[in-house]
A protein has these predicted regions:
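N-terminal amphipathic/basic-hydrophobic helices that include classical n-h-c signal peptides
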Residues: 1-19
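Sec-dependent signal peptide recognition
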Residues: 21-26
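C-terminal motif of bacterial Sec signal peptides marking the signal peptidase cleavage site
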Residues: 34-35
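Short, low-complexity, disordered segments immediately C-terminal to signal peptides
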Residues: 39-47
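Active-site signature of cysteine proteases
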Residues: 39-40, 54, 59, 174-358
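Active-site nucleophile-adjacent alpha helix/oxyanion-hole segment immediately C-terminal to the catalytic cysteine
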Residues: 46-195, 208, 213-218, 251-256, ...
């Protein structure tokens, strides 16, 4: 199309109809329990051609494997790019965060005998968790993508209800997590320096460095509110802004060298990781703000997945796209990255987390 080679990402009633459309989309994309850990089959051919306008630096694409940790992978990737764009180099461990979050939930479950152990969450949770438990770098603390965190969580749940003493439980829990995830050490060694995990986390993410945004009309714009989605387990508040303002925040950050963490719905048939493209098959005919609110209230837009926005691009027709780094490995035409249309982001965004420096 116009002789442009396909861009490669550098390494580094109406409601009834909508419900029917969503049901078909779910069946077609085989979306099941795993949520953000589910890889979908390609639903479109790879024929789109893109021109990259802005591409930020990134660490290598990771694979979250059998886990619901997309929120941790995406938020850590955002922090990694932030440092790379400043000339620093960090590659951060989602598995460290997973272990600490499992330990926290396991201790609570042992005492209360209530609840479950789960790794579902939202991007702001990552900031809270590393502020409490610290962080390690990827080379020192990671498991392979075959580790099934759903199985690990079930083992921990059974152990917590097994009639052990607290000391026995702590010892057995540590042994289980050492074996199934990775052994924790009290020091982080990085580029000749030695940190505690908390010191390392504070060097990576400063207090108030990021702000979370959303865009829904059941709360007033210009004010924060606690977003009513099941995975908002820490009851985080998100600044509510019009959707056009939210997209402008993304574009402005990317143009100034800051990545953005994106969270939203991926159950539309136009979202296809294996072809590396996400578009809306049916663009809303009315006001986007009203349409996205209607889909949210009817549970047609849900909190499915989290990824890192790292660039701006356009297709052969001049339509704008965001370049997004996923955490499902590199098995697609863009080596694990995707081109996601701005229209898709406008319609299907649940929230973003962006740098506060602008």
């Amino acid at each position: 199309m116009n002789g442009t080679p396909r861009a490669q990402i550098p390494d580094g009633s109406k409601n009834q109809y909508a419900m029917m459309k969503k049901a078909i989309a779910i069946l077609c994309t085989c979306m099941i329990i795993a949520g953000c850990g589910r890889k979908q089959p390609a639903l479109r051919t790879v024929g789109e051609r893109f021109t990259n306008d802005v591409v930020l630096k990134t660490t290598p694409v990771k694979d979250q494997g059998h886990s619901d940790m997309c929120w941790a992978y995406a938020m850590l990737a955002t922090m990694e790019t932030e440092h790379l764009m400043q000339g620093d180099s960090v590659n951060l461990s989602a598995d460290y965060v997973a272990r600490k979050f499992i330990e926290e939930q396991a201790s609570r479950l042992f005492i209360t005998r209530r609840g479950t152990v789960s790794l579902r969450g939202m991007a702001p949770m990552l900031i809270h968790l590393i502020g409490i438990y610290g962080l390690d770098h990827y080379d020192a603390f990671h498991t392979d993508s075959t580790t099934d965190y759903h199985v690990v969580c079930r083992k921990v749940q059974e152990m917590a209800k097994g009639g052990l003493s607290l000391r026995q439980f702590d010892n057995r829990l540590s042994a289980l997590l050492d074996r199934d995830i990775h052994t924790c050490i009290p020091r982080v060694y990085m580029l000749g320096a030695v940190y505690t995990p908390l010191e390392f986390a504070h060097s990576v993410c400063r207090d108030n460095e990021y702000q979370a945004f959303t865009s829904f009309t059941h709360h007033p714009f210009g004010q924060p509110f606690i977003l009513e989605v099941p995975d908002n387990r820490f009851s985080d508040a998100f600044m509510n802004v019009p959707i056009d303002s939210l997209v402008s925040i993304i574009v402005r950050n990317i143009r100034h060298g800051h990545p953005v963490c994106w969270e939203g719905d991926i159950s539309e048939p136009g979202f296809a990781f294996q072809s590396g493209v996400a578009t809306l098959d049916d663009n809303p005919g009315g006001d986007v703000q009203d349409e996205r609110q209607r889909e949210f209230e009817n549970h047609l837009t849900t909190d499915d997945h989290c990824m890192e926005i790292v660039g701006l691009a356009h297709d052969s027709k001049g339509q704008p796209f965001f370049i997004i780094k996923n955490s499902w490995g590199t098995d697609n035409p863009y080596h694990g990255f995707m081109y996601v249309s701005v229209d898709y982001v406008k319609m299907k965004t649940i929230c973003i987390v962006a740098h506060t420096g602008l």
